[in-house]
Swiss-Prot record:
Protein's recorded name: Small ribosomal subunit protein bS20
Sequence similarity: Belongs to the bacterial ribosomal protein bS20 family.
Ranges annotated as spanning the membrane: none
InterPro entries: Ribosomal_bS20 (IPR002583), Ribosomal_bS20_sf (IPR036510)
One Gene Ontology cellular component: small ribosomal subunit
Entry function: Binds directly to 16S ribosomal RNA.
Keywords: Ribonucleoprotein, Ribosomal protein, RNA-binding, rRNA-binding
Gene3D superfamilies in the cross-refs: Ribosomal protein S20
Source domain of life: Bacteria
């Protein structure tokens, strides 16, 4: 356990930051799941709308250091590829 007051404060801040980061990470995952769900249903328009929202949230996560830029780019690229194949197939 921390003995110095500054160390105690840092421990409190870490707990607070961890909760915020977990909430943001969970929100990003939820938006990604919404895109995947719309793709599985075959809704082109809804999938495109969900992707634009998810892309925005993912990039906000990058800005807040929740996920790394390459990870975000990979996720967006894979979702875009799935939507593109959905649009071409039907």
């Amino acid at each position: 356990m921390a003995n110095h007051s500054s160390a105690k404060k840092a421990a409190r801040q870490t707990v607070k930051r961890t909760l915020i980061n977990k909430a943001r990470s969970s929100a990003i995952k939820t938006f990604i799941k919404k895109v995947v769900h719309e793709i599985s249903l075959g809704n082109k328009e809804n999938a495109n709308l969900a992707l634009s929202v998810a892309q925005s949230k993912i990039m906000q996560g990058v800005k807040k250091n929740i996920i790394k830029l390459n990870t975000a780019s990979r996720k967006i690229s894979r979702l875009s590829k799935q939507i593109k194949s959905l649009n071409e197939s039907k």
